[in-house]
Amino acid sequence: MEIKDQGAQMEPLLPTRNDEEAVVDRGGTRSILKTHFEKEDLEGHRTLFIGVHVPLGGRKSHRRHRHRGHKHRKRDRERDSGLEDGGESPSFDTPSQRVQFILGTEDDDEEHIPHDLFTELDEICWREGEDAEWRETARWLKFEEDVEDGGERWSKPYVATLSLHSLFELRSCILNGTVLLDMHANTLEEIADMVLDQQVSSGQLNEDVRHRVHEALMKQHHHQSQKKLTNRIPIVRSFADIGKKQSEPNSMDKNGQVVSPQSAPACAENKNDVSRENSTVDFSKGLGGQQKGHTSPCGMKQRLDKGPPHQQEREVDLHFMKKIPPGAEASNILVGELEFLDRTVVAFVRLSPAVLLQGLAEVPIPSRFLFILLGPLGKGQQYHEIGRSIATLMTDEVFHDVAYKAKDRNDLVSGIDEFLDQVTVLPPGEWDPSIRIEPPKNVPSQEKRKTPSLPNGTAAHGGPEQHGGHSGPELQRTGRIFGGLILDIKRKAPFFWSDFRDAFSLQCLASFLFLYCACMSPVITFGGLLGEATEGRISAIESLFGASMTGIAYSLFGGQPLTILGSTGPVLVFEKILFKFCKEYGLSYLSLRASIGLWTATLCIILVATDASSLVCYITRFTEEAFASLICIIFIYEALEKLFELSESYPINMHNDLELLTQYSCNCMEPHSPSNDTLKEWRESNISASDIIWGNLTVSECRSLHGEYVGRACGHGHPYVPDVLFWSVILFFSTVTMSATLKQFKTSRYFPTKVRSIVSDFAVFLTILCMVLIDYAIGIPSPKLQVPSVFKPTRDDRGWFVTPLGPNPWWTIIAAIIPALLCTILIFMDQQITAVIINRKEHKLKKGCGYHLDLLMVAVMLGVCSIMGLPWFVAATVLSITHVNSLKLESECSAPGEQPKFLGIREQRVTGLMIFILMGSSVFMTSILKFIPMPVLYGVFLYMGASSLKGIQLFDRIKLFWMPAKHQPDFIYLRHVPLRKVHLFTVIQMSCLGLLWIIKVSRAAIVFPMMVLALVFVRKLMDFLFTKRELSWLDDLMPESKKKKLEDAEKEEEQSMLAMEDEGTVQLPLEGHYRDDPSVINISDEMSKTAMWGNLLVTADNSKEKESRFPSKSSPS
C-alpha cells in the first residue's frame, strides 16, 4: 500500500466548504514512514497508567481579544500542504504552540465560545429476550463518576486514570475516523443519517449494514436516575432524601415524574428552542405540553409535562442539575459492540448550534459534541477505555477549549498531543489502576498551558504570587490635602446602597446574632473594669452607650464596614494611669481626658489630611501575623483566666470528710475586730452590731454588713458553693466544642447541603441558645451576664457632656497634647493594622477599602466620646477577623467531588449596624440577657481566638520544628527557601511576639503601640539576613527606594530586549539532526517513533487492505 507523507494526511480533504455544511475531515491511516518492529517489542509492551491533569475548578472567562493571525494561519496551511514526501514539520511548531495559537484566535460567531460541559458515557447493552438499549455507565462534570456494578448507584467522584494505550487508540480514531465539525442537525436521527452517509461514502462502512447500525444508534437510552413507574410504595426512605426533596424545586407533578424524552416526538424544525446564553430548555415545545416549569439556581429553566400513560416515564435528577453551571452543554459518548460489524465505526461530531437531543443526556441540556465508537464483538473493554479517554479529555480545560475552536482534525490531534505532553505517567509495577484517586482540594491552574511560555523542560524562575501586598491605589500618596480621603469617598460612594441590598441573606442574620453576643460581654466587662479604675466615673452603661454610638456611625460611614470596633487593653492602661495622675494632683479626670481626646482627634485628622495612611504599605505579613497572633493568644488567655477567677467567687471544698457531712455549716457572725471603715459605715447608717441577728442574714446581707463566715463549709472569706464552678467549666468547654463541631458541620456527610450550610452559619448562636436552655433546665446558679437596666450615668455628679477645661487650670488644655501624641500612635496603629488584616487580597474584597475614611470616622467619634465622657473605641482585631470569617461566600454550583470555591466576602454594612443598634437597646432587654451564663461567653471568646489563629502562617511554621522533613506539608515556601532559613524567620517572629506579650501584660502596656511600630524596623533589618527572593516567599516585599526601583526597571527592560532579540533569531537545523536543547521535543514527532503507535498503524493498514477487497456498494453522498 502506498505510504503518504504526514503533512498531506494531516491536511483536511475538504479545504473549502459551504457554511451550511458540516466540515468533513477524513484524514489518513499513516502519518510516519513504515517501521518494522521486533516481536519482543510488541509482546513485551506493558500498559502505563497516566495521572491526568485534573481540570480547573471553575472555568475562568476566556480571552476574547482579536487575534490578527488568520492570514498567517492560512499561509501556514499552504506551506504545510506544499511539503514534499517525507518532509517534517518545523521543530518549533509543537502541539503546545499550535494549541496556544488556536486558543488565541477569536471567531466571528458565538458558536465557538467555550461553555462548561457535562459529559456522559453510554454503552449499548444486549440482553436475551429483551430489546437492546443504551445504558449510562459514567459521567463527568469535573471528575469521573461510574455506575457501580449491581449497586444501582453512583460511585464517589474520583480523578480518572487512563491507560496510555487507550489514549493512543483515541488519537488514531480521530486521525482515521469521521470528523464532522459544525454540523447543523436538530434530532439524533438526522445526526445518525449524516454520520452514516459519510461513513459509507468514505468506504469505512458497508452499505448492507448501514441500516442496522442506524437502528442501533436509535435505541432507547436508559439513565441511572431513570425509574419505571410501579405500584410499590417505598417504605424505607432516608432523612437525607427527604431533606433533599424538600429543598429541591417542586415544579413537577405530584408524583415527581416527567416524560422520558426518548419516547416523545421530536420537533425537527424549531432549532431555536435552545438558548445559548442561559441554556433555557423548553420542554413544552418538544412534548406539546402547557405546564410551566421552575428556574433552577444555575439558570436552567425546565418546562415539564406528563405524557400519555402508556409511555415510560423517568425522573429528572434536579439535585444533580443544581451542580451543573449555567450555560452548560452536553457531550455524549456512545460506545459499544455490534455482532454484525467487522470493523470499527468512529465519528466525532460537533453541532452548531447546540441542540437538545431529547432523551440522549441524563439532564435536559443542549448537546454540543458526540463521539461514536462501534465495533465488532470481543473488544468491549477496549472501547470502554477509549470512551473514558475522550470523556476525560473533554473535561480537561485546554482540550475542552480546543474542541470548541477546532477548524479541522489537525487541531483536535494537536489538542490530544498537547494533553499527552502534560500528563504524568504512573509506573505499572508501583500503582494499582483500580485504586480511585480522591479529587484534590485545590486544583492547579491551567493558564500556563494556554499562554506561550519557555520551551519544554526549561524551568521558569518566577517569583511567587503576591497575595498579601498593600500596593494598591488606596495607599498611593496624592500630594494634596485630604486627597486620599476624597479618593476613598469616591471609591466607596457607588457601593453605598448595595451595601444594604447585599445584606439580605440568612448568613448576615447568623453573623449578626453571633457577633452581638460576642461583642456584648467584652464591652460590659471593659466598662466594669473601667468603673473600678475610675471610681465609677466611666462604667458599664457609658461603655454600652459609647460602643453603640461609635459603632453605628462607623458602620454607616466607615470605609471598611467589615471592621468591628471595640475596646483595647492599652486604652484601659492609659485610663488607669491618667486617673491616678489626676487624683494625685487634684485635677478633674473627665475634663483632662476630654482635652486629651480632642487633641488626639485633631492629630488623627491631620494624619488623614497628609495621607499618612499610605505608610501602611510598610506593614507586611511579618508585622500583621505577630500582632494578630498576640491578640488571638490574649483572647484565649483571658478566657481561661476569667474561668479560673470564678473559683474565687464560687470556691469549692477540696478535702471533704463524708462522715461529717451532717456537721458541715457556714454561719454569718459579727466581726471580732471591725475596721475603722466598717465602724464609720455602721455609724453613718445608724446600725448597731448588737441589734443585728447575724445568724439569720443571707450571704449578700452578711457581705454588705462586713460579717465573718464561720464553720466547716466556709472558705477564705466565702462559703463553699456546691457545683457552680464545675458546672461553669462544663458550660465553658461544651460551648467551645459545640461551636467548633457545628461550624464544621458544613463539610459533613449528613443532611442536605442547605441544612448543613444553615447549621454552620448559625453555629455559635445555636450553641449559645442550647447552653442557655440547658443551664436554665439544670437550675444551677451559674454567674450570669449583668446588663445595666437604667439609662443614666453611673455617678449622679456627672452628666452626658463634659467641658474640656472644667475646674482644671487653663494650661492643662495645652499640656494635654503630650499624652495625646501617645494616644494618637496607639489609635493609628491599632486601627490600621486591623484594617490591613481585613483588607488582605486573600479575602477577595471587591468594593475596595478606605484607610483614610476609616481613620477619619474613628477620630471624629473619639472626639465626640471625649466630650460626652464615654470610653474610646478602635478596631478590634479578633472581632473583625471573626466578622469576616462569618461572611465568607462559596460557590453554589460545584461539580461532584469539587470543593466549593471561595468567592470572597459578603461586603455590607447591615451586620455591623444591627450589632451596635441592638447593643444600644440592650438596656431594655435586661430581662432576656440575664439568662446568658458568663462561662458560655468565655467559651465563645476562646473559640473566637482559636478560630482566628487558622490561616496564620506563623503557627504552620512553628509546627515544622517537630516534624521530620519527609512528613512536612507541601507548603510552597518550603520548595524555594532552605529549611534553616524558614526556622530562622520563625524564631525571629516568635521572639518579637514574646516581647510584645511581655509588654502587653506588664505595667508598660501603654507603650505597646510603639513596640508594634518597632516591628516594621525589625522587618527592615531582616533584609540583611535573607535574600529578596526568600522574603518574597516568606513575607511580603517592603516598598523600596525610588532609586532602586529605577535600577530594577532598567534591568527588566534590558532583559526584555534580549528576549526579543532571541525570538527574532532564526535557528537553522544542523546535520545529523543535532538538537541544542535535548529537553525541547515535539511530542507528535516522538510519538510516531514509538512501538505502540506503530502497532496501531499496522492494524489500520490491515483494515485498509480488507476494505480494498470489499469495496463500498454505495456512491459518495
UniProtKB/Swiss-Prot annotation:
Tissue: In the brain, detected in cerebral cortex, subcortex, cerebellum, hippocampus and medulla (at protein level). Expressed in neurons but not in astrocytes (at protein level). Isoforms starting with Met-Glu-Ile-Lys are found predominantly in the brain with lower levels in the eye while isoforms starting with Met-Cys-Asp-Leu are most abundant in the kidney with lower levels in the duodenum, jejunum and ileum (at protein level).
Subcellular location: Basolateral cell membrane; Apical cell membrane; Cell projection, Dendrite; Cell projection, Axon
Region span, Disordered: 1-23, 58-97, 282-309, 431-476
Post-translational modification summary for this protein: N-glycosylated.
Domain of life: Eukaryota
Tagged with keyword Glycoprotein: yes
Ranges of biased composition (kind: Basic residues): 59-76
Segments on the Extracellular face: 530-537, 583-595, 647-719, 783-808, 876-911, 956-997
Xref: Gene3D superfamilies: Helical hairpin bin (1.10.287.570), Mannitol-specific EII, Chain A (3.40.930.10)
Membrane topology qualifier: Multi-pass membrane protein
Reactions accelerated catalytically: 2 hydrogencarbonate(out) + chloride(in) + Na(+)(out) = 2 hydrogencarbonate(in) + chloride(out) + Na(+)(in)
Keyword set, alphabetical order: Antiport, Cell membrane, Cell projection, Glycoprotein, Ion transport, Membrane, Phosphoprotein, Sodium, Sodium transport, Symport, Synapse, Transmembrane, Transmembrane helix, Transport
GO cellular component: apical dendrite; apical plasma membrane; axon terminus; basal dendrite; basolateral plasma membrane; CA3 pyramidal cell dendrite; dendrite; GABA-ergic synapse
Function comment: Sodium/bicarbonate cotransporter which plays an important role in regulating intracellular pH. Has been shown to act as a sodium/bicarbonate cotransporter in exchange for intracellular chloride. Has also been shown to act as a sodium/biocarbonate cotransporter which does not couple net influx of bicarbonate to net efflux of chloride, with the observed chloride efflux being due to chloride self-exchange. Controls neuronal pH and may contribute to the secretion of cerebrospinal fluid.
Family under the similarity heading: Belongs to the anion exchanger (TC 2.A.31) family.
Protein name from the UniProt record: Sodium-driven chloride bicarbonate exchanger
Species of provenance: Rattus norvegicus (Rat)
